[in-house]
Amino acid sequence: MIGKRAVLLCAFGSSDIKGIEESIGILKKDIEVHFNFRIKVEIAFTSKIIVSKLHKKGYAIRDLEGSLQQLHENGFEEVIIQPIYMMDGCENLKLREVVALYESYFSKLIIKRNLFGEEKDFNKKAINETAHIIKKYSEKYSNILIAGHGSKINDNSI
């Protein structure tokens, strides 16, 4: 018998509530629909400063540690963590360090790969899929800003 399962979408965070709802919130709903609402899907931010700002605005969200603790306390046995980082950089390393502290809490705790987690991912298909997503949203919104930043680790090879 399969125990209670959850997907935890993990990002650095944003203090823009509308931005959260129109990005990672949509992804959360899509995953819930995909699994016919049989799997709990939650969002966690790794930035404690962002989480604190959101709490002051009355927006309920947990940091990664709080989410893992809550899932454990609620009897979840299998948790899939999907980082919402483009590449395997510093934030992903921090995520792995935190997750390692909670491995014994669950029968299965898996961290999935980032969109461009490995060099083999820098291929035409992945780039075309990313371009398709941008095109889809450009039909609804007149302006789209794509932003990113570098990393001090070697995976910053894009």
Language model: regions and residue ranges:
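Extended amphipathic ligand-handling, pore-lining, and cofactor/metal-binding catalytic surfaces
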Residues: 1-158
